[in-house]
A protein has these predicted regions:
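Residue-level signature of mid-helix packing/kink "hotspots" within the transmembrane helices
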Residues: 50-58, 137-138, 142
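Helix-to-loop junctions at the C-terminal end of transmembrane segments
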Residues: 55-69, 147-149
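Helix-loop boundary and gating motifs at the non-cytosolic
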Residues: 2-50
């Protein structure tokens, strides 16, 4: 029973880890266009997210390596990313949006690698666990796309 519970937790972690990525990534450009951002501004926003994830990945990797509470750190990073994600709803001003988006990715981006490390350290079957991430991503793309089609792009962040 212990192994089954451990597997379920790892599978659920990856499913829900990749759901937000699947919900947001395919539609973010269209959403930003719908709130009035130019193509250049859309490119800046999305590239700042990536740059933030890369830069802060170094910091969070060091913190992760030096902490005993690895799961708590990951949970705190999830929470912070979620808060910043909600804050993106509060603005349509480019500079404010790009700042909040970069802050969100400072927490969200590095979580993927840290979770990979946690799963491998636990001795889980990484490819099996990772496949649940692909399932979560795919499910979120379908659900979010359907929701956006029915309710408009401006509604995608409420998911």
């Amino acid at each position: 029973m212990e192994k089954t519970t451990k597997d379920f937790k790892s599978h659920a972690l990856y499913f829900f880890l990749y759901c937000p990525l699947g919900a947001m990534t395919p539609l973010i450009g269209q959403y930003l266009n719908s709130i009035g951002f130019s193509g250049t501004q859309v490119g800046v926003v999305t590239s700042m997210g990536t740059a933030s994830a890369v830069l802060f990945g170094l910091l969070w990797g060091r913190v992760y390596s030096n902490t005993q509470s690895k799961r708590r750190l990951i949970a705190a990073m999830f929470l912070a990313a979620g808060i910043f994600s909600i804050l993106t709803l509060s603005t349509k001003v480019f500079f404010t949006y790009v700042t909040i988006y970069a802050a969100m990715y400072a927490f969200q981006g590095p979580v993927y690698g840290l979770c990979d490390s946690l799963v491998i350290a636990n001795g889980d079957n990484f490819s099996k666990v990772r496949s649940f991430g692909a399932i979560g991503f795919s499910a979120a793309v379908y659900i979010t796309g359907s929701y956006a089609e029915a309710h408009g792009l401006k509604s995608i962040f409420s998911i």
